[in-house]
Amino acid sequence: MEELPATAIGLKVNDGIVLASERRLSYGGYVLSKQAKKVHKIGKFLMAGAGIYGDLQTLTRIMNVEIKYYEISTGKPISVHAAAKLLSVILYQYKVMPFISEILFGGVDEKGPQLYVLDPIGSLIEDNYAAVGSGARIAIGVLESEYDPNMNLDIAAQLITKAIKASIERDITSGDGIDLAIMDKKGNYENKFIPY
């Protein structure tokens, strides 16, 4: 499979999770938009991705509805793992005509911060940090050299920003600013935009 345009990065530390992506929306050598948000809050979860932008938007809408449906029908909140597994099943259902996307999905529950990586057909992998998209090869080197699960969320946000900036410098399909989503271990959420 060809690399999917964009760069998205996720990082799990003891204090929470951070997801980030750049904002460029491009196909081939053409930049369609410089304002494409690829990091979303879905209920109490965070999701970021690389790939076909319409597919990412559709998956975000589907997950919003499915999570609400689960919680209404069961009367209890869905766990991070169960929500990630739900996304995995949704992706697998479309394996013949897949969503062209690589997804980072995370959140915090009673088991602590969790980060999952999903491919277009629903493979589900839990990890401490991950990068997807065309800038992933560049970003992962930055993450591997400096990642520490004991770093605080501010340092984690700085590291993820550094990794995205490195990708923007070398990947033509990444650029136009950085969206950061931060969730601490209590579930508090913060969203930031960093011009770059």
From Swiss-Prot:
GO-annotated cellular components: cytoplasm; proteasome core complex, beta-subunit complex
Keyword annotations: Autocatalytic cleavage, Cytoplasm, Hydrolase, Protease, Proteasome, Threonine protease, Zymogen
Family: Belongs to the peptidase T1B family.
Modes of activity regulation: The formation of the proteasomal ATPase PAN-20S proteasome complex, via the docking of the C-termini of PAN into the intersubunit pockets in the alpha-rings, triggers opening of the gate for substrate entry. Interconversion between the open-gate and close-gate conformations leads to a dynamic regulation of the 20S proteasome proteolysis activity.
Sample GO molecular function, one term: threonine-type endopeptidase activity
Function, in words: Component of the proteasome core, a large protease complex with broad specificity involved in protein degradation.
Organism of derivation: Saccharolobus islandicus (strain L.S.2.15 / Lassen #1) (Sulfolobus islandicus)
Pfam families: Proteasome
Gene Ontology biological process terms, A to Z: proteasomal protein catabolic process
Keyword NADP among record annotations: no
Name of the gene this protein is made from: psmB2
Top-level taxon: Archaea
Residue positions assigned to the propeptide: 1-6
Location within or outside the cell: Cytoplasm
Active site (UniProt): 7 (nucleophile)
UniProt-recorded name of the protein: Proteasome subunit beta 2
Catalytic activity: Cleavage of peptide bonds with very broad specificity
